[in-house]
Each structure stands twice: as C-alpha cells, then as structure tokens.
C-alpha cells in the first residue's frame, strides 16, 4: 500500500545522512523541514498501531461492514478488508486511531476550544474532498464511521495493488501501455482540477490498479482546495515527485505542481527509473530545483517533447492539462476502456444549482465542511456567498456535499428498513456516486425517506458531522457521514463476545486470489453486479477452503425443510456473515440446483444475477445420484468461471499484441517518412549549396573588382560627400624643390606654408642632411615617417609655428625653416582670403590677412560655449568625421558637409593635396588600408576634404601641438601643418571619455596619460627651446595613430627621472596604427579641462621673414608656468590612473586609450599645448566650455580616432569667445612673438612651451632630438631614397612598438620602420642617438611593459574582411550573432560600440582551442561597402582563425541573403 512507501519516505528525512549543515542554502533546509512536517498529514503520519490496541477489544463489525483480514499496516495505522453484509460489496477500511489526532493537528489551523472535539483539520479536509469527487479513475469514499477510539474510513477496495509494485515487477513499460495508464491519471487529475482541488502527492505508490488494470488515484491526505485569491504554501509531497516551486519553498499554484508530478510518473513508466534521484535529500532537492535531467535517447520524439514540456522549471511555462490531452503522444493511442459503464461523473458546468432561500435552510454541518474546505474561512463569508445570486465555488461544493449526504442517507435508510433477501440484490456502488437524482436539500430525492429529510434542515440533528458519538456507550458506532434523524446504532461485535463457528470466520477472510477471482467473474457479467454474484462466488470458492464437507449438507437441508422451517431458520440465523449471509448462501444453492434439476439443459451463459427467483423446492429424499449431479453442476460452474477468466486473458493478450503490431508498423512508417524527408533535405541542401557557390563566386568576383578599385591610391572619391576632394585630386603643386624658407616664398604663402610630403618634390636642406649624416642617418624617404621634410633650426621652427611642418619622423619632408613657415603663414592667410580661418569663423568676416590677435580672438571664441556646436562640427569634419559612427552616417555627413561648405577654398588644402599626391607617387605606404576606418582617410583626402574651421592659424598650430598627442601630419600630407582643417583649440573630451577611463570602453581623445605628458612638459618649463629641442625626435613615435595596439610603446624608453619625457613618449606611443578608440564623433572633450598652459609660438610675419615680434612681459611667462604647475598638480591623479589603466589594458586587452583634449592659452612667450585634464573626473575641477575645443586635423599616421592635442593659438585663453576680445589677443601676440630665444618650434608637430628656464627645456627634449647640440640647425637636404631608418626600424621590430603591424601603415605617411627609428632616437641628450635608442631597449621599465600589450599585436593578429554590406548592416548581423553566443555562453564580456563600429569580447577557453581568446572587431564604413577588421588581443592563433572563419561565414551568408532579397 501507499502508506508503507510513505513511511519509507518519511524515514529518509529523518536519517542522519540528511542532517544539513549551515553552509547549504537556508531555502533547501526550510524545504526539507517542511517536507518532514508534511508527513503529519492523514496519509503521511508516522503512526504505528497503538499498543493499547492489543489490550482493547478488536473491532470486527462497523455498521453494515464486516471487517476481515488486515491488508497492510502503514503510516495511517492499518487497512483492513471489509464486506458489506447487505450488498456483499468489498471495501478497504482505513482505521485511524484517535489517540494520534493530536499529532495530526496542523498548527496553522488549530481548533478552538469549542471545536476541540472535531477531527483534525487535515483528516476532515480529506474526508470532505473525497465526498466531493466521483470519477472512474479516483478511489471512492463509501462511508465514514467512528467510535470512542477510532475513525473508520470506508474506501473503495482496489485489488490490483499499487502501480509502484507493478512497475518494479515489470520494469519499464511499452509506450502504448504506459500511455494507457497515463491517460487515466490525467483524466482523474483533470477532474480534480475542475474543482480547483490539487492532489499534491501524486506518485506511483498512490496510484492503484484494479483487476482490469484501470488506474485509481488514492491518498488525498495532501489534497487541498486552491482558492483563486490565495496560492498554496505548504511544501508537501514526496521529494522525488515534488515540483521545483514546492521544493524552493515558494507559494505556488497546485495544478502546475500536479502536472510536474505526472511528468515524473510518465518518465518513470517509460524508463523504469526516476529523472531526479539521489540518496542525499539535499542533493535531490537541488537537482529538482535545477530541473536538469538526462533524457533517454530511446524514447520517442513525442514522449521526449511531452516530458520536456511537463518538466519545465518555470510553472508558467509548463504545459496545461488541456494541452496534454491533445498532445500527439496521447492522440496516437486509443482512449482507455473504463469498465464503469454504470458510473457517470458529474459535469460541474451543467449543474443546475437552486438558489438557497434563507440562512435557516443552510445545513450547519455542511457549512462547517465548507469552512474547512476553504482554509478555515469565516462562516459568515460563506453564508453570504451561498445566498448571493451569482454562481460561486461555495454553492457548487454545497450542492455536492448535499448530494453525497442524501445518497448515503437513502442507502442507510434502505439498509435499516429492509431485512429481506432482495435487499442483498441491490446494485453495489463501485464509486461514491450512483444513478440517483437529488434535487436539493429541501425536496430530497425519490426515496421513502424524503419526508424525513424535510423535517429538519440538518440530517445531523443533535450531533456534529465529525464529532465523536457522545450518546454511544462503550464501543457503539455512529455513522458520522450519513446518519438519519434517528440513527441506527450498531453494537460492535468483538472477538471476545462472538459465539459463531470458527470456520465461518475463515470464509470471511478470503484471500486476495479469491477476491480477484470474484471480481473477475463480476467484471465479465452483465452490467448489474448484485448480491447473487457475490454469493455464487462464495459458493465457487468453498471447495478451495472447506471441500465437499461444507457443500454436501446444504442441499439436503434445503430439501427436507418446508417453508415453515425455512422461515424459522431465517429468523434464527446469525453469525459472522451478518444478518442474512448464511440464509442467502442456502437460498442461492437451492436456486442453482433446482434450476438445474428442472432444466436438464446446461447452464446458459446468462449471468447468475439474471436467473429467475427459485420456486419452492419439492421435498424429496436425496439420493446419491442427485448429490452427484449437483456436485457435477458445482464443478461445471467453477469450470465455466475459469473459461470466462481465460477468455478475458486471451482478449487482453490479443489487444496487447494488436497494439504492439500497430506500434511497430507506426514506427516503421515514421522511419520511412524520416528517411524520405532527410533525402529530400539533402537534395535541397545540395541545390542550395550549388546556388550559393555560384552566387558567392560572382560576389567574390565583384568584391575583388571593387576592392581593387578602392585600394587604388587614386580611387577614394566615393568615400565622402561629393563636395569633398579625393586623395587623388591633384592640387596645384607648390613646385618646391627645397625646404629653404626663402625658396618659393609665394607658393609657400599661398599654401599656408604646407611642405610637400613627397621626397621627390622636396629638397631637404643641405645642412640638415649633413647633421643627419653625422649621426649615420641618410635622409631618405622613410616608409613610416610623418613628415619627410628635413630638420630645421629654430628659425625654421618659428616659421613652422606659423606654417608648421611635420617633424622628421612625423613628416620628414615637411620641415621648413621658420622664415619660410612664417612667410607661408602670413601669405597663406592673406592670399587665401582667410580661408584657413574661414572654418573657424562663423561670421565669415575675415577677408584680410589674419593677425595673431585676430587668431587669438577666434580661439577664445571657439573656447566659449556659444560656439560649442561649431566645435563639434569642426571636430567631426577635421578628424572624427574620418571615422564616423557606422550608425550615424547621416549625422556625421551633415556635420562634415556643413564644415566643407564653409571652407571650400583653402590654398593650404590644395597644397596638401598636391603633397599627398607626391607622397603617394613616392611611397606605397600611402595606399589606403581598409582596416582603418573612414576617419583615417582624412590624411589621404585632399585638404578640401576637411573644412579648416580654424583658419590658417589653426592649420599651423595643429601641427605644432607639443602635446604627446602624436602630431600626425600624415593625413594632410601637405602643409607644414598637417593639422589642416582642424581647429587649433583643444577639443575637450566628452564626459563619456572620462567615464570610460575606469570602464575601459572607448575613449575619444588622446590618452589622458599621454596628454598629461604635455602637462609635465609644460611644468618642466623647458619645453622646446629654440633649436636645441628636436620636436621630430620626440614625436617620431607619434607617427602612427594612437590605438590600443600602440598603447604606450615608447614609454619603455623614458628615463625614470624624466617624468616629462616619459609622458611625452607615452603619448606619442599611444597613437598607433589603429587609434580606433579615439574618434569621438562630434563630441567635445569636456573632461579634459583646458590647462591652457600649452602655448604655441605663433610667429607672425605678415608678408615675409621681417615680421617684428614683440615679447610679452615676463609676468605672462610667470602666469603660464603657474598654470602649468596647477594643471600638473590637478592632473597627477589622472595621470596615475591613466598609467594604471594602460597596465590594465595590457592584461585585459581592452586597451581603452583615455584621450584628452588640449587648449592653448597664451601666458608666456613660448606656447605649448597643455592637456585639458583638470576637467576630467580624475584630474581637476576645471571645466572648460563644452565643445569649446576642437580637433585639428589629425597629424597622425592614420587619423583614425586620434584626437591629437591641438596647439593653441598664442594667448588663447579660456574666455567666452567674444569677438571683442580680439584686440587683447593681438596685443598679447605681439608681446609673445618678440621673444627671440623662446617659443620657436622646431617642427610642425612641436608646440612651443613657455618656460623661465630655456636651458632646462633644452635638456628635456634633446634626448629625443636627432639634431646635434646646436641652437638652430638648418634644414637638411632631401633624404635619399634609401635611409638607414628602414634598417633601424627592422632592428627595432622586437621593441614594443606603437604599431601592431609590420610594414607600412597604408593610411600613414609613416611606417613602422620610421617609428622604430624614432624610438631608437629617444636617447639621452648628449650621447649618440643610436646608443640612446639601444640603451632604451636594454633598460626595461614599467611603461615598457605596459606597452608590450600593444606591441604584441602583429599582422597575423589582424584579419581584414571586405564586404559589400554597409557598416550598419554589418554591425547588426555581428551584434545579433554575438548576442546569441552570449546567451549560449560561448562568449562573454561583449562590448559593442555601435557609434564607432567597435566590438570586443572574450571567448572562453573551452570554445577557443584551450586558451581564452580576447578579440576586437572594427567595422569601417566605406559608404557603399564596408571593411571589417578582426583583431586578436589575446589567445592562440587557431582559436583566432576559427573566429575569423565564423565571422567570414556570417558575412557571406548575409551577403547572399541580401542578394536573395533583391
């Protein structure tokens, strides 16, 4: 029985192995305790038979029920077999000792004192629920009796035993058999759920099988009514079958929990084992909570699908009963046959419930039952609902309880009033419902007792439904369920007072085989099962027990007695059979044998129950022949019974064989269908592959043509808006053949002094060439140089401030003498009608030569918030626009277009284009590399590509930026100021950039660490003094755009004591090949407050070298130094943070370069660019106007994202940019320009730095200089075609480089080789530069280590994929795939910046060939197409190649889909 198994489950909880430690979750502990407490229910109580039972008299008769043998002992005490003495019906009596009621009491529903005599809440609720339900697949409750000591539940007897035992015996079942049982379980549960009743303890131990293998759901000790307003709370049931929400200790809905249990049962039926099982209860509960189990592969697809849906951890996702009933697994098998044709279940939807008239008509006992059923709901609330006109559950349950009461009352009355033999022939109830119609409590039913019911609204008159009989004495029993107004009480007979023969008792204790045989015979009889059947069965079984000695005397007695003697016998017969059992037995024997005698024909197949009543038996002398005939007839009946049983068995076997054959045929058909479907899919796949292959070939061919077209140095016209000039546009050549500032003065002036980057068109100054040859360097075009112009003296630097030339390493050929630059700047501004300033001017008011004062005024204007929008546009147009966000093409194009329209006529741009063309002709490094974003094209496009909003002054200053922001002259191949088109003012970093410093996303301005290097230089004061400081050397590393790959490559070269140089080198190194993090489109560097201490010596000579320069007073210089110091102090923390950030970048491969902007403020004669860091969250509190600063056109190799520091115009203060401040700036400029020994910038990239100690500044920067220790070297001669630089670069390959790739940066005029040369040149001031470089290689430092992360990136770590998809489409596809992989768990730490087309992530080692793979993806928008760069930051090559293959496949697939959509 289920009770035994329940007790075993209870012991599992109590076992020592299940004592839980505090380390485990409190939730599981709570559930374990809750499940343990749940055993205190009726069906789960651990109660052994009381020892007092042995001392007291054993109860053998309960009302009309005669108790028989004990069927089992378990948690409920015991279960005994019983037989109804009037109908012969068998039942199972569950005996619950009242001494255990206190243990059963639920603390939550504790009784009040006046209700102390009532049954425990759990038992009472179980009784009420079983009264309500009547279904062929649910065990019925026949009766409830009680006496002083015990409670008796008369339950339907089910002889087949537990499904659990059957499963243990048979093992896993065939699917058709398992589904047959499962359907019956679901039907029964569905019926329960219609009443909102949940079983909550479904398991094979509580599922019983009758003789015909029909399921009966038993044990409702855990059942509960679920009220809509309230979830169930009790954690109950068996842990193996309990749902996760019950195990988790949550409030839950009962119906989904029952479905979970049914899913476990279905799994067990099909597999023979449980999905969740463990000896340790804690581990078991955790397994259930996880919901993960192994699905056996041999199960059918439908079975797997249904089990999976039923065992969903989330109850909301779990399948419903209705969906289960229509599932294909159940649909493919016929409905189970139910042998209870006489039983009809109640359709609760069609119940016609009559309105209750008043409170007086409400049965008080049923009202109490409803209160218990609804979780001790207040009776007043229930009464109000019963009297309401609307339908409600209370009314339905009231009706059902009333119906149950009337049925059992009529049966009881019938039992009390009828003592004749016919009463034994009434139909026995197989369930709690019979075909009896009950109108309501007022009208009663069609029985003779209707009138008695009307006498009182309650049939319980003076007693409570579940109260002990107080009037009964001793062991007097009371029927507490169906007691009429004058209940009949039965004295309990006991083993001490019974006086009947022992053999009669033996007949009562029939074995289970006898009962099974009896049930078999009755099952195969006609619809009616009456007392005759039971009696005949008893006769048939007598030979098995007593032999002929019992049967032979019976007929003789009947024949020798007359009617009078029979009546006498009828009155006197009493015994263990009950009132009339023995007489019934005698009469049946007479009936059978007399019929046989009268009718010589053999017994027909008509059931015994349909035989006519026997006539009075004739009196005759028995003969041996007669006895022999009758014995033969008896044996014939037994034989007939065996034949019927055999027929049943054969039919069952035939049905099973038929089902097996159907199942086999169905499987074969399914396999054939699957094979056909697979073959069809294979053919379709082959066709698709062929089509895809053809399309791919066509696509590849078209893409190759397109790529070749784009890779051409002369085919970039379609990259930007139509009014931009392409890189290949020929600009009027300046015709310069020399770097002498006096050569081609007019041409230089017209072009704002932009030098030609092409070595073929530039003649390097002879003096400079000699100087370089002294150091063993041939001045030849370097594949990696920013400026191919040669080094110049301070005078040249002065001119380069006005018309900055790119430094040797940044632009070897752009070096010019200061006089030439000065003249170029002055003439350039005049001749171009202020075109260089036009971009800066919003009023377009300058059609005259630009003075320094005017320029300063414009600078101040740009710093003010009033022109913040313009600043954004300038930044977009000059640098950031080259690398537009792939999802904001329109916005970026608008900004660029606006800028272009304001600056369409810039002579400087024309010269830059010309220079670019020359450079392209000379050096293959200028070929566009698709791995750089659109921003990198800025250097390749003609100067017209970017509007020069700052004017000529801006252009020149942009290249003069002293800041470590790597002066990138690359893009504007022209012009001493490769910063053409970029506003001189610092762009302030948007606050996002600062916020990203900690988060390591993408920072859009030069790395704060690098920028702070500027601050140090400024603070050192010695920054760039006359010719002693070679800016090119210092910024040679800046040849490449700042990227995560370069990071801090040159930091390792800095000397420990020279913080300033360290910062400078750091910044330069940070600008590497792919500064793709920097491009902050249209955003202003608000975070890096302008420490406008970096000034640029804008040497203004209006028409030639004879410009008079006035020196500003020393107090300006003091102011400048003070500000520098203040900025340095403010930014100390920021600098440290940035350094730490770089180290983290090395580890995490996130390489998020913190960028900052710079503002130039005139406070000294020398002008340097100070990093605007005080506004950053890390730095200081200084807050420059948002968007007041601007990017100058990138002078870096690629221009990608680089937000280089922008040299400030002299004396540009951070005032609101009012135009009326131009005069002040003019005066300040005069003072500044007159200082002869300070502020002359050696290179276009270099910014001048005001300092009271020019000597110190010389020493500071000399270590980076290639020039000898002299005041002002002359411009060197043009570099020869082959320079040792390349070899030096090769030697330096092993050194941590800023650039991740070898060879040329195709967007840069500087190659890695030249940059390596630069790093070699970064040595101590007095020694040979090569020695210094070698020394830097052999002297490790923390910065060098931090730079290693970027240097690790090699060409093999970058894969370029070109595609016809637009950048937006590409980002969308990749983002979608990454999200899927992220959910799948095969990728983590995904960071997607849609604006800049940057994607990073980490692939765990188990998905990346054993080593964690960190990667980054850059998407470059090429207008009508795009290019994707997959970069390996960390991991093995195999995993990286797999990633590249996957990305390539995704892109090709999307291209094919795109073609198909067309």
From Swiss-Prot:
Organism field: Candida albicans (strain SC5314 / ATCC MYA-2876)
Main location: other
Record PTM text: Phosphorylated throughout the cell cycle, except for the G1 phase.
Name of the protein described by the UniProt record: Serine/threonine-protein kinase HSL1
Matching Pfam families: Fungal_KA1, Pkinase
Alphabetical list of CDD domains matching this protein: STKc_BRSK1_2
Keyword Transferase in annotation: yes
PANTHER family in the cross-refs: MAP/MICROTUBULE AFFINITY-REGULATING KINASE, NON-SPECIFIC SERINE_THREONINE PROTEIN KINASE
Its EC number(s): 2.7.11.1
Chain's gene name: HSL1
First-level EC class: transferase
Gene Ontology annotations of biological process type: biological process involved in interaction with host; cellular response to glucose starvation; filamentous growth; filamentous growth of a population of unicellular organisms; G2/M transition of mitotic cell cycle; invasive growth in response to glucose limitation; negative regulation of filamentous growth; negative regulation of filamentous growth of a population of unicellular organisms
């Amino acid at each position: 029985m289920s009770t035994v198994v329940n007790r075993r489950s209870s012991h599992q909880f109590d076992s020592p192995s299940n004592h839980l430690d505090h380390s485990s979750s409190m939730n599981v502990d709570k559930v374990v305790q809750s499940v343990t407490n749940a055993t205190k229910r009726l069906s789960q109580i651990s109660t052994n038979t009381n020892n007092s039972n042995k001392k007291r008299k054993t109860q053998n008769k309960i009302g009309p029920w005669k108790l028989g043998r004990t069927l089992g002992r378990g948690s409920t005490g015991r279960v005994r077999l019983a037989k109804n003495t009037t109908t012969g019906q068998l039942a199972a009596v569950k005996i619950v000792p009242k001494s255990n009621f206190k243990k059963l009491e639920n603390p939550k529903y504790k009784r009040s004192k006046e209700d102390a005599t009532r049954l425990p809440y759990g038992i009472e609720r179980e009784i009420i629920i079983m009264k309500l339900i009547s279904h062929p697949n649910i065990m019925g409750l026949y009766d409830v009796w009680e006496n002083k000591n015990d409670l008796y539940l008369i339950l339907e007897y089910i002889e087949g035993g537990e499904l659990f035992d059957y499963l243990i015996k048979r093992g896993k079942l065939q699917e058709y058999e398992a589904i047959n049982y499962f359907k019956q379980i679901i039907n029964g549960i569905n019926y329960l759920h219609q009443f909102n009743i949940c079983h909550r303890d479904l398991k094979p131990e509580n599922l019983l099988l009758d003789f015909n293998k029909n399921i009966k759901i038993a044990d409702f000790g855990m059942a509960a009514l679920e009220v809509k307003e309230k979830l169930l709370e009790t954690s109950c049931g068996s842990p193996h079958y309990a749902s996760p929400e019950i195990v988790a200790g949550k409030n839950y809905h009962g119906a989904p929990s029952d479905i979970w249990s049914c899913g476990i049962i279905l799994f067990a039926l099909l597999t023979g084992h449980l999905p969740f099982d463990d000896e340790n209860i804690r581990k078991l509960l955790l397994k259930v909570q996880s919901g993960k189990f192994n699905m056996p592969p041999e199960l059918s697809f439908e079975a797997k699908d249904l089990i999976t849906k039923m065992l969903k951890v989330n109850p909301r996702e779990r399948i419903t009963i209705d969906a289960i009933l229509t599932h294909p697994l159940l649909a493919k098998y016929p409905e189970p046959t139910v042998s209870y044709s006489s039983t009809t279940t109640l359709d609760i939807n069609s119940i016609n419930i009559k309105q209750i008239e008043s409170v007086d008509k409400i049965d008080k006992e049923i009202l109490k039952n409803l209160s218990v059923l609804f979780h001790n709901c207040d009776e007043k609330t229930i009464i109000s609902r019963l009297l309401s006109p609307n339908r409600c559950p209370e009314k339905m349950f009231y009706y059902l309880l009333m119906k149950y009461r009337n049925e059992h009352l009529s049966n009881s009355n019938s039992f009390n009033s009828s003592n004749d033999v016919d009463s034994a022939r009434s139909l026995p109830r197989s369930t709690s419902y019979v075909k009896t119609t009950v109108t309501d409590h007022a009208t009663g039913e069609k029985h003779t007792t209707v009138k008695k019911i009307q006498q009182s609204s309650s049939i319980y008159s003076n007693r409570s439904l579940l109260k002990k009989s107080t009037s009964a004495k001793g062991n007097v029993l009371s029927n507490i369920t169906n007691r009429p107004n004058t209940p009949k009480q039965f004295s309990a007979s006991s083993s001490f007072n019974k006086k009947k023969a022992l053999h009669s008792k033996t007949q009562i204790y029939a074995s289970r085989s006898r009962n099974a045989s009896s049930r078999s015979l009755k099952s195969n009889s006609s619809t009616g099962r009456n007392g005759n059947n039971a009696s005949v069965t008893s006769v048939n079984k007598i030979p098995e027990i007593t032999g002929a000695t019992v049967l032979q005397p019976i007929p003789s007695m009947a024949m020798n007695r007359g009617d009078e003697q029979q009546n006498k016998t009828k009155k006197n017969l009493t015994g263990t059979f009950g009132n009339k059992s023995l007489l019934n037995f005698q009469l049946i024997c007479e009936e059978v044998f007399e019929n046989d005698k009268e009718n010589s024909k053999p017994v027909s197949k008509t059931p015994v129950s349909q035989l006519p009543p026997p006539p009075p038996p004739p009196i005759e002398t028995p003969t041996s022949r007669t006895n022999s005939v009758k014995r033969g007839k008896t044996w014939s009946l037994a034989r007939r019974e065996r034949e019927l049983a055999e027929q049943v068995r054969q039919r069952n076997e035939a049905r099973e064989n038929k089902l097996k054959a159907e199942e086999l045929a169905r499987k074969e058909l399914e396999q054939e269908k699957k094979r056909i479907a697979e073959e069809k899919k294979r053919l379709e796949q082959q066709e698709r592959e062929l089509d895809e292959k053809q399309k791919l070939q066509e696509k590849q061919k078209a893409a190759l043509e397109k790529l070749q077209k784009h890779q051409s140095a002369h085919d970039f016209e379609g990259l930007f808006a139509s009014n931009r000039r392409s890189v290949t546009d020929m600009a009027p050549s300046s015709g310069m053949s020399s770097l002498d500032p006096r050569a081609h003065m007019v041409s230089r002036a017209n072009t704002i002094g932009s030098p030609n980057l092409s070595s073929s068109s530039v003649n390097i100054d002879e003096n400079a060439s000699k100087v370089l040859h002294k150091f063993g360097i041939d001045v030849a075009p370097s594949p990696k140089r920013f400026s191919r112009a040669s080094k110049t003296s301070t005078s040249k630097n002065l001119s380069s401030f006005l018309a900055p030339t790119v430094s040797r390493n940044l632009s070897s050929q752009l070096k010019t003498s200061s006089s030439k630059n000065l003249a170029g700047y002055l003439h350039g501004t005049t001749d171009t009608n202020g075109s260089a300033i036009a971009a800066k001017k919003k009023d377009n008011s300058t059609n005259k030569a630009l003075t320094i004062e005017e320029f300063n005024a414009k600078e101040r204007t740009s710093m003010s918030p009033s022109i913040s929008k313009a600043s954004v546009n300038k930044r977009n147009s000059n640098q950031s626009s080259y690398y537009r966000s792939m999802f904001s093409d329109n916005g970026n194009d608008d900004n660029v277009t606006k800028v272009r329209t304001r600056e369409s006529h810039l002579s400087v741009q024309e010269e830059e284009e010309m220079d670019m063309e020359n450079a392209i002709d000379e050096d293959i490094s200028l070929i566009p590399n698709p791995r750089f974003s659109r921003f990198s094209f800025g250097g390749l496009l003609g100067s017209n590509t970017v509007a020069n909003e700052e004017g000529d002054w801006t252009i020149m200053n942009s290249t003069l930026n002293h800041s470590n922001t790597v002066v990138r002259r690359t893009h504007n191949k022209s012009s001493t100021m490769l910063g053409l088109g970029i506003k001189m003012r610092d762009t302030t970093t948007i606050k996002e950039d600062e916020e990203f410093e900690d988060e390591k996303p993408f920072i859009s301005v030069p790395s704060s660490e690098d920028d702070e290097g500027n601050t140090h230089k400024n603070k050192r004061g010695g920054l760039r003094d006359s010719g002693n400081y070679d800016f090119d050397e210092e910024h040679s590393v800046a040849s490449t755009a700042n990227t995560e790959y370069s990071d801090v490559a040159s930091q390792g070269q800095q000397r420990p004591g020279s913080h300033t140089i360290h910062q400078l080198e750091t910044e330069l190194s940070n600008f590497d090949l792919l500064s793709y993090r920097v491009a902050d489109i249209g955003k202003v560097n608000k975070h890096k407050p302008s420490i406008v201490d970096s000034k640029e010596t804008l040497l203004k000579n209006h028409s030639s070298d004879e410009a008079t320069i006035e020196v500003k007073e020393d107090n300006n210089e003091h102011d400048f130094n003070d500000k520098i110091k203040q900025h340095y102090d403010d930014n100390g923390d920021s600098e440290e943070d940035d350094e730490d950030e770089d180290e983290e970048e090395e580890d995490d491969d996130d390489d998020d370069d913190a960028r900052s902007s710079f503002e130039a403020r005139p406070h000294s004669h020398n002008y340097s660019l100070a990093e605007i860091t005080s506004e950053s969250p890390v730095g200081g509190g200084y807050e420059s106007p948002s968007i007041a600063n601007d990017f100058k056109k990138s002078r870096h190799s690629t221009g990608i994202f680089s937000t280089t520091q922008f040299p400030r115009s002299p004396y540009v203060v951070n005032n609101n940019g009012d135009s009326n401040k131009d005069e002040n700036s003019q005066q300040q400029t005069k003072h500044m320009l007159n200082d002869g020994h300070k502020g002359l910038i050696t290179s276009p990239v270099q910014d001048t730095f005001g300092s009271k100690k020019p000597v110190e500044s010389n020493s500071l920067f000399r270590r980076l200089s290639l020039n000898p220790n002299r005041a002002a070297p002359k411009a060197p001669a043009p570099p020869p075609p082959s320079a040792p630089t390349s070899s030096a670069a090769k030697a330096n390959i092993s050194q941590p480089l800023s650039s991740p790739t070898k060879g040329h940066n195709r967007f840069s005029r500087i190659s890695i080789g030249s940059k390596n040369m630069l790093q070699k040149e970064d040595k101590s001031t007095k020694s040979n530069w090569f020695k210094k470089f070698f020394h830097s290689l052999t002297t490790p430092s923390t910065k060098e280590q931090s730079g290693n992360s970027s240097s690790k990136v090699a060409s093999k770590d970058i894969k370029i994929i070109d595609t016809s998809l637009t950048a937006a489409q590409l980002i969308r596809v990749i983002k979608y795939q990454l999200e899927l992989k992220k959910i799948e768990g095969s990728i983590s730490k995904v960071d997607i910046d849609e604006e800049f087309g940057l994607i990073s992530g980490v692939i765990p080692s188990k998905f990346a060939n054993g080593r964690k793979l960190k990667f980054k993806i850059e998407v470059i928008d090429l207008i009508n197409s795009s290019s994707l760069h997959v970069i390996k930051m960390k991991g093995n090559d195999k995993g990286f190649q797999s990633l590249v293959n996957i990305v390539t496949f995704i892109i090709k697939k999307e291209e094919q889909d795109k073609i198909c959509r067309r």
